Amino acid sequence: MSASSTAGQAGLSYRDAGVDIDAGDALVDRIKPFAKRTMREGVMAGIGGFGALFELSKKYQEPVLVSGTDGVGTKLKLAFQLNRHDTVGQDLVAMSVNDILVQGAEPLFFLDYFACGKLDVDTAATVIQGIARGCELAGCALIGGETAEMPTMYPDGEYDLAGFAVGAVEKKKIIDGTTITPGDVVLGLASSGAHSNGYSLVRKIIEVAKPDLDADFHGQRLQDAIMAPTRIYVKPLLSLIETLPVKGMAHITGGGLTENVPRVLPQNTTAVLQRDAWALPPLFQWLQSQGRVADDEMHRVFNCGIGMVVIVAKEDAERAIRHLQAAGEAVWEIGEIRERAEGQAQTVVV
């Protein structure tokens, strides 16, 4: 195009294309104090550089790095609908740090990816403040991230999230389930709600039942129960691991109880869970009744009140329960490990 064809016209800018660099800079300034509160030993350089640096502690003799990545799923659609963005950041952190925790890893640092069509600084800052809160609960550093403003890629007011956690475990202390044997005890730690899984079904139930999400629900608004942030189990379980032998752990996420517990079991074993060992929390009772959801479907979609499973030897069970209760966790003995019969499922709820 010749210079004369644009005479008298202002040149185009990135802002004209839908990307506001100034808003991105303002967001970085807003979130730096949040990230600073998460800093821990090992962080050499955090937010602002091209790459974040982390020095692994010399306390490890044979360190093994453990990584995990996840998102928040369609729980975000409810966040948009309700215009509340204060809990999904913690959800994002929890999904990854709880995953790497089950192998005995201490989460060291976390990075986030926030993508949107048009950047709303207040919304993004609220989300990232929640991410920082989750990192504090997990004891890991929010060491970096990416904010991607991509015009026309997302509807106005919507965004997507992804998170990445890296932790470390001593090689000889990796928890992989290989020592699990028949007779071991299955403990269940309470969830805070539906956590971050099954929300496509939650949203469908809401669509069909048309409840008042601001109505009182056992002392809180129904929307508060539905949007409760995912519980982070890192500190109490790292403490337990240092106290007694933990044979296996399972983070109860997508797939519920019946599809996550088998992921840590030897092929010749099955976990038999007693459905009356813990009370089904009110939120799940409501979801089941409003959606007329079958028991088996509940167990393979939702955590049903159990956010983390811990497997220990029978002789260690009572001590483990006392330790976790002292750390503030609600915990129950919910089942046992048995020898697996031919053709039997690896986890059954009876």
From Swiss-Prot:
It is found in: Cytoplasm. Its EC number is 6.3.3.1. It is an enzyme of class 6 (ligase). The keyword ATP-binding applies. InterPro entries: PurM-like_C_dom, PurM-like_C_sf, PurM-like_N, PurM-like_N_sf, PurM_cligase. One of its GO terms (biological process) is adenine biosynthetic process. It comes from the Bacteria. It catalyses: 2-formamido-N(1)-(5-O-phospho-beta-D-ribosyl)acetamidine + ATP = 5-amino-1-(5-phospho-beta-D-ribosyl)imidazole + ADP + phosphate + H(+). Belongs to the AIR synthase family. This is Phosphoribosylformylglycinamidine cyclo-ligase. The lineage of its organism: Bacteria, Pseudomonadati, Pseudomonadota, Betaproteobacteria, Burkholderiales. The gene is purM.
